[in-house]
């Protein structure tokens, strides 16, 4: 019973971290269509931020769509929420290195990370 309760708490806190990050991003950008920033270049940055706060999460890549997402809590998540895992596979170290170099966010990463730590109190380490 205790093990099941701990697992449920851990999953709840993983999902809570995911929600906190998305809410913080919504507060930061405050513009229509802001989510597109994380579908066109910012997907690896988001997956990295989420990965820092979600133990056991796995970077996933879709080479067809050139998109990155994070697998945790038995599902695949990006800025849109839970998404289909079709055409995704766990990213190798080489693919992670590729994404770091080529999936370039179209926003000021340093400024956003400072906001997330200072204003939203998210426990971020180094993100890239």
Label the predicted regions.
Residues 1-128:
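A structural boundary/capping signal
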């Amino acid at each position: 019973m205790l093990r099941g309760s701990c697992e449920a708490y851990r999953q709840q806190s993983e999902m809570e971290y995911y929600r906190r990050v998305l809410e913080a991003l919504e507060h930061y950008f405050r513009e229509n269509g802001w989510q597109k920033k994380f579908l066109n270049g910012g997907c690896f940055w988001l997956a990295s931020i989420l990965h820092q706060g979600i133990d056991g999460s796995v970077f996933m890549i879709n080479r067809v769509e050139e998109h990155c997402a994070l697998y945790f809590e038995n599902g695949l998540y990006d800025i849109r929420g839970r998404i289909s895992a079709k055409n995704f596979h766990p990213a190798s170290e080489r693919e992670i290195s590729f994404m770091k170099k080529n999936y370039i966010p179209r926003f000021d990463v340093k400024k956003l990370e400072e906001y997330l730590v200072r204003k939203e109190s998210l426990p971020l380490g180094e993100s890239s």
